[in-house]
Regions:
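Metal-dependent phosphodiesterase/nuclease catalytic metal-binding core
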Residues: 66-109, 114-137, 142-172
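Short, charged N-terminal beta->alpha structural module
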Residues: 171-193
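Active-site HxH/HxHxD metal-binding segment of metal-dependent hydrolases
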Residues: 1-44
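Residues immediately within or flanking Cys/His clusters that coordinate Zn2+
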Residues: 329, 347
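Short cysteine-rich clusters marking metal-coordination/redox-active sites
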Residues: 332-335, 350-353
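FMN-binding flavodoxin-like domain, especially the glycine-rich phosphate-binding loop
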Residues: 87, 98-136, 141-143, 185-200, ...
């Protein structure tokens, strides 16, 4: 921390901007005497080295600046271009198989830490493009001294919310196993069609990993049980997390489950409807506890629709998430029980909570 540094080296000059100074005070660090405040385009010459400062707000804090050393052509990039994971004795990205050992951590770092701020990242990349950068030193992860174009291309894709892989991510949240079984069968059917697929049980896997692959894949299937007339909580947490990170331009599909009142599909569609350019395939699979005899054909149809959409073949039937299919019949506003019929008898009472017909809505 700056405070610890100044205790050990009281003559140190802290170089920062005005917002950084305000944050130092908020964290109860005494404002250092003789601090040097800099802004966009300012330079600092230390002899052979001249550092130029560039603002990078919200990548990923509002005060962030990066600095460029013109002598050695080094970009000190703060959190940009960083990764999760320990170095384990490795200093440079070209000393490892980055795709195998680091790419997943780099993507997970970007999506979870910076992913919401794609426009700000693109603005920083535009500034960097005008510099003769030959080495990138981030705060987290290995240093880059080769293949900088590879790194920049990844960031451009992530920051513009473009998928890296045309394939399907399946995220399932199951209570008694019925939803998980259906999700597993769908994954098998997609694999049989040659479609790249990744399956996660969001009750077991932390949502940060699923969010990362949501940025990676072009298509996402959300499969969730109904819980207390809502979305099973691990799935709701994932959906909220994806929405909060501003993911967009994806095609999705839904599998909902509910032993007596399946409602998760409609609610998942509502959350997806708040996101930009999220489309849903028409094929929504509804389970009641588990796959019923003959329902495997619904999964086959969903696999066909997903495969066609992934391949960009004849346009798969899609609809705006706001128009996602609604359950047929009438739903109890108290407990969520669905009465499947075109009409509701006036003397009807909910078999679950006992409420009268007046407490039902279409």
């Amino acid at each position: 921390y700056p405070g610890d540094l100044l205790v050990r080296y009281p003559g140190t000059t802290i170089v920062c901007n005005g917002k950084s100074m305000n944050l130092l005070r908020q964290f109860h660090w005494s404002a250092p005497k003789g601090a040097m405040l800099v802004k966009e385009g300012d330079t600092l010459c230390t002899g052979r080295h001249t550092f130029t400062f560039y603002s990078a707000p919200m990548v990923h804090w509002p005060e962030v600046m990066v600095s460029y050393d013109a002598a050695d052509h080094i970009l000190f990039s703060a959190d940009a271009f960083g990764t999760f994971g320990a170095l384990n004795g490795v200093l440079f990205a070209d000393e490892v198989d980055f795709d195998r050992d680091w790419l997943d951590d780099a993507r997970r770092y970007y999506t979870n830490i910076v992913g919401k701020y794609g426009p700000q990242v693109l603005a920083l990349l535009k500034k960097v493009e005008g510099l003769d950068v030959r080495m990138v030193c981030p705060l987290h992860g290995p240093i880059w001294r080769r293949d900088l174009g590879y790194l920049m291309d990844k960031y451009k894709k992530w920051a513009s919310y473009q998928p890296e892989v045309r394939g399907v991510l399946i995220a399932c949240a199951s209570i008694y196993g019925g939803t998980e079984t259906a999700a597993g069968i769908l994954a098998c059917r997609l694999a049989e069609r040659g479609i790249p697929v990744e399956l996660y049980d969001v009750s077991v896997t932390h949502c940060s990993y699923v969010l990362s692959d949501a940025f990676k894949y072009s298509h996402i299937v959300f499969a969730s049980a109904t819980y207390n007339n809502g979305i099973f909580t691990p799935m709701e947490e994932l959906l909220r997390d994806i929405a909060h990170h501003a993911l967009q331009d994806r095609t999705g599909a839904l599998i909902q489950n509910g032993s007596w009142a399946p409602a998760s599909g409609k609610l998942m569609a509502q959350i997806l409807g708040e996101m930009k350019n999220m489309e849903l395939l028409e094929q929504t699979v509804t389970l009641k506890s588990a796959l019923a005899p003959g329902q495997d054909q619904e999964l086959e149809a969903l696999a066909d629709a997903l495969a066609a959409s992934v391949r960009g073949e004849q346009e798969a039937p899609e609809q705006a998430v706001a128009d996602a299919p609604k359950a047929k019949g009438f739903i109890c506003k108290i407990c969520g029980f669905i009465y499947e019929s075109d009409t509701l008898p006036e003397d009807f009472r909910c078999p679950i909570c006992g409420r009268p017909a007046s407490d039902f809505e279409p």
